[in-house]
C-alpha cells in the first residue's frame, strides 16, 4: 500500500485523510500544516459541520496524530522544500494547500524525499488526470500530476459518455456551486475579482471556472468545444453541473439516459452515478461519486440540442478520486 503525506489540512486535506481511512486503499503517514497545531488537528479531523463526526478514534499522542490506532507524523513547515517527507516514509504527497499548484512549486516536495506529488487542484502546467476519463494515460515517468478540479471531475465523465456515443459539436457548462473557503462571510476586499468578495451566504455570485476548458485537456477531441462559468450559491456543499450541448448524431433523450445508465453500471461504476429519483442537493452530501446524472432534470430541445444535469459532492467525491488516482499511480510503479 502506498505511503502518503498530506500538505495542507484544510477541507480537501482532511477529507482525503478521511477517504483514505474509510477505504483503506492508501496509508497516510504524515501531515504538514503550519497553521494548525496538533491538538487543533485532532479537533478539526474529528468534528465536521458538513460530513458529521468521524466514525473512529482520533487523538494526539507523543507529538503524533493517531487515527484508528495509526500514528501519523506531524510537520509545521511553511516551505514545502523543508518538509522531511522521506524521514516519515511518505512516497506520495497530496498537495492540498491550494497554493503550490505549479510544477515548480509542487516540485519542492521532491526535495524532502517525496517520490511523486498529486496536486488537488487544477494546474497551469502539470498533467491533469480525471479518473475514468484519461487516467490510463498516466505513466510513471511523471513525478507531478494534478487531479484537476471537482467540477472537471463531474463534467468530464459525462462529456466522455456523450461524446463517445453521440459526438459533442460544442457545449456550454454552468456549475451551480456551493460556497468554498476562498469566499467571504460578509462583503470584503477580493483583489481583482470584485464579485467574489461579496457575502457568500447572501448572494448568487457569477464567477469564472476553468473546469469546462480543462475537459479539453483530459479529452483532447473536445479541446476548444467547451467553455463555462459558475454561479456560487449559499449552500455549504454539493454542486451541480448543467451541460448544454449540440450533438453530432441525433439522439432521443431516452437514448442519452440509456447510455449514461450503462456507463454508470459498467466502465464508470463508482465514478459516474445515475438516478431517476426526485433528488435535491442535500441528497448527495458525502456521496463518493465524481458525478451523478440526474435523468429527471435534463431536457431536450430537439434530437441535437440537450441540457444535461449532473450532481457532485464537490468536497468528498473529489477527495475520494484523489485517493483513487494515487492507487492507480501506485499500480504502475
Swiss-Prot record:
Gene3D superfamilies the record matches: Dihydrodipicolinate Reductase, domain 2, NAD(P)-binding Rossmann-like Domain
Locations listed in the record: Cytoplasm, Cytosol; Cytoplasm, Cytoskeleton; Nucleus
Residues bearing the modification ADP-ribosylcysteine: 150
Modified residues (Phosphothreonine): 151, 175, 180, 182, 209, 227, 235
UniProt PTM: ISGylated. S-nitrosylation of Cys-150 leads to interaction with SIAH1, followed by translocation to the nucleus S-nitrosylation of Cys-245 is induced by interferon-gamma and LDL(ox) implicating the iNOS-S100A8/9 transnitrosylase complex and seems to prevent interaction with phosphorylated RPL13A and to interfere with GAIT complex activity.
SUPFAM superfamilies xref list: Glyceraldehyde-3-phosphate dehydrogenase-like, C-terminal domain (SSF55347), NAD(P)-binding Rossmann-fold domains (SSF51735)
Domain of life, source organism: Eukaryota
Cellular component GO terms held in the UniProt record: cytoplasm; cytosol; GAIT complex; microtubule cytoskeleton; nucleus
S-nitrosocysteine: residues bearing it: 150, 245
Catalytic activity: D-glyceraldehyde 3-phosphate + phosphate + NAD(+) = (2R)-3-phospho-glyceroyl phosphate + NADH + H(+); S-nitroso-L-cysteinyl-[GAPDH] + L-cysteinyl-[protein] = L-cysteinyl-[GAPDH] + S-nitroso-L-cysteinyl-[protein]
N6,N6-dimethyllysine, modified sites: 3, 64, 192, 213, 225, 258, 261, 332
Positions carrying N6-malonyllysine: 192, 213
Crosslink position(s): Glycyl lysine isopeptide (Lys-Gly) (interchain with G-Cter in SUMO2): 184
Protein name: Glyceraldehyde-3-phosphate dehydrogenase
Naturally occurring in which organism (per UniProt): Spermophilus citellus
Gene this protein is translated from: GAPDH
